[in-house]
Amino acid sequence: MKIGLLGTKLGMTQIFDDNGSAIPVTILKVGPCYVTNLKSDTKDNYNAIQIGYQQVDAKKLTKPQLGHLQVNNLPPLKHLKEYKVDATHTFTIAQQLDVSIFELGQIVSVSGVSIGKGFAGTVKRHNFTRGPMTHGSKNHREPGSIGQGSTPAKVHKGKKMAGRLGGHQVTTKNLTVVHLDKDNNVLVLKGCVPGKRGNILSIK
């Protein structure tokens, strides 16, 4: 089972392939991450490693968070995440993981929080068709009927209506690694990833 790392979205740009075609790419700052905890099949009923990312000032963490890290002489780390693995004997507490675990041409999945767009109507949120814009119509961007009458006398759960758009945990799959900079821990992926510049992402 492949492990993952945490990273930060730096932004997007484009590169040109051998044929001169422009390829949109996303630049990520990945790691370095520290192994902060190990879960074993015998003790926890599953094998996993917990990694920490982004060193911060100690006063920005709670005492339980600091204690969890200080037990293993680890620096204050803001973000913790667990990844399931087949076996944990190849990892050690306080081991440092960086972008070198990825390979050129590897297919990865990236998870993060999508850009929040606030309260949105049905046209923007669900791609509803607009009503007539002329000839006396007053139904331009209204959602229309949201259900039947006295039977069932309720609006069904999951009905597409206006509401908050974006700001959800999203995973983008099948992204190709097109460049690696191991000296600066920079990963370049073909395509786009969730969130805005500065978002914390999980690359797996």
Curated annotation (Swiss-Prot):
GO BP terms: namely: translation
Keywords attached to this Swiss-Prot or TrEMBL record, sorted alphabetically, are: Chloroplast, Plastid, Ribonucleoprotein, Ribosomal protein, RNA-binding, rRNA-binding
Can you name one GO molecular function term for this protein? Answer: rRNA binding
According to its UniProt record, where is this protein mainly located? Answer: plastid
Task: For the region Disordered, give the residue spans.
Answer: 126-155
Instruction: Spell out the subcellular localization from the entry.
Output: Plastid, Chloroplast
Q: Which InterPro entries would you find in this protein's record?
A: Ribosomal_uL3, Ribosomal_uL3_bac/org-type, Transl_B-barrel_sf
A Gene Ontology cellular component where this protein is annotated is: cytosolic large ribosomal subunit
The record describes its quaternary structure and partners as: Part of the 50S ribosomal subunit.
* Protein role: One of the primary rRNA binding proteins, it binds directly near the 3'-end of the 23S rRNA, where it nucleates assembly of the 50S subunit.
Similarity comment text for this entry:
Belongs to the universal ribosomal protein uL3 family.
Designated name of the protein:
Large ribosomal subunit protein uL3c
Species of the source: Guillardia theta (Cryptophyte)
